[in-house]
Amino acid sequence: AQTTEGALNEINNNLQRVRELAVQSANSTNSQSDLDSIQAEITQRLNEIDRVSGQTQFNGVKVLAQDNTLTIQVGANDGETIDIDLKQINSQTLGLDSLNVQKKYDVKSEAVKSGGGATLNTAGLNDTALKAGVGGATNGTAAIKDGKVFFDATDNKYFIEVEGLTAGDATKNGVYEVSVADDGTVTMPATTKVAGGMPATATAVTETQPKPVALSTAVKDQLTDSGISAADAAKGQLVTMSYTDKNGKTIDGGFGVKVGANIYAATKNKDGSFSINTTEYTDKGGNTKTALNQLGGADGKTEVVTIDGKTYNASKAAGHNFKAQPELAEAAAKTTENPLQKIDAALAQVDALRSDLGAVQNRFNSAITNLGNTVNNLSEARSRIEDSDYATEVSNMSRAQILQQAGTSVLAQANQVPQNVLSLLR
């Protein structure tokens, strides 16, 4: 009980510090970086609570790692016991595993482009009028609408819209699919217009922008190995990340790989190639698995991994053994509402267990005192009994001695009478 209470005292100290930090975070003058620093310490404090819970033990018994009842024998007979009800106390059971005071960043991603300017190449175009028109024709002057190329991420295709042709060449105005080389050169290979016009999902990029860098085979393999379809992996884009906080400050977020609405954290290697950040762990079956690090969490930029439908901080899941170790706390998906109320509830939970343990310690003290009194009383009773027995035996011994002495005296006298008679006869 004392060992457990000592551990709970340290947990209480950590919770008090977490509450102080939560009070600080409620101040609107904090910048986003201030909140990040506060959250970092809160996370460390909660990790320490989990460590204390998992490692505190008495005689090999972990006293806070799980709900348990310890039975202590306090008497000499069966049933003379006192039970200690122990509870699992960690960030999860306290309801603080997803405590987060950060504010969400405004996340922006921009496709990584290869170097070089872009030019419109019509060398392979077999329509003389259109080819001449794009370069400057007689029947009006053709131009790429708004001077932009459009990209449709859904189908991973590029388009331009030709306008300005007149008279007999007016029918050539419309939307055409084009290809974009790594150096940014836009090639118009066909004369067949796109049915239905510009796709609704296409977004404009300036004509002079180079083509986004294509994902390498290695990166696509990482995506497909994680369960993403080959079709979706083929549509993925390498992007640069930036985050804008509530005060309008923008910070660089490095590289990422965008697949649909999801963005995975990526790293540029020394050889210039890119790879998605991964986390290795051991699943519930004891198998080593690898998960892709996705950008998310309450702030929108924390690296998280999804394992068995649950989302964890990548830093916590790294190397974790889900078969042999306790379940991890899930990553916070949003800023915690009423954090002080949650912390106060956690403190009340710890205080309740400490009160129970204090009461048990008082019971132990009472049992020890009672046993001491019993021992003293029994010792005194035994002493009195032994004194009485001794007195009885002494009395019996005295009686026996008296009888023995009396018998000896009578026998001596009896022997003396015949001697006297014989003396007279002589």
Give, region by region, the residue ranges found by the protein language model.
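Cysteine-poor, low-complexity segments in flexible/peripheral regions
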Residues: 81-342
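Primary detection of the long, small/polar-rich alpha-helical "axial" segments characteristic
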Residues: 1-118, 164-165, 317-426
